[in-house]
């Protein structure tokens, strides 16, 4: 049985810096992950003004083609395209053999 192919590098045009949280409430030195993909999301809030929130999105990190890839911790600060964001959730996506294929990192 073959595993799932990596996300092609041509689909991973962005770079991301990651600053993991430290126990004292500060953040560690930034670590760079190259060849990631950031897709913005826009949500409408259910307030009286129907305001839209376009600051968040999902970062895709491939286990093979993202240089410097590692499992980013929820609560970390990341920067993609000059925008600093907070990691809300990290989804580990595995292939059929249980190996990490990629991570989907929800940021806001």
Feature-to-residue mapping (PLM):
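Short, conserved turn/kink motifs that form compact alpha/beta structural patches or helix kinks used as
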Residues: 22-108
């Amino acid at each position: 049985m073959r595993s799932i192919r990596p996300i092609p590098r041509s689909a991973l045009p962005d770079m991301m810096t990651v600053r993991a949280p430290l126990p004292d409430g500060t953040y560690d030195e930034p670590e760079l992950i190259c060849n990631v993909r950031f897709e913005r999301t826009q949500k409408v809030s259910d307030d009286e003004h129907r305001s839209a929130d376009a600051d968040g999105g999902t970062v895709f990190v491939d286990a093979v083609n993202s240089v410097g890839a590692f499992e980013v911790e929820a609560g970390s600060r990341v920067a993609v395209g000059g925008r600093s964001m907070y990691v809300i959730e990290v989804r580990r996506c595995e292939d059929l053999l249980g190996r990490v294929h990629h991570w989907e990192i929800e940021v806001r």
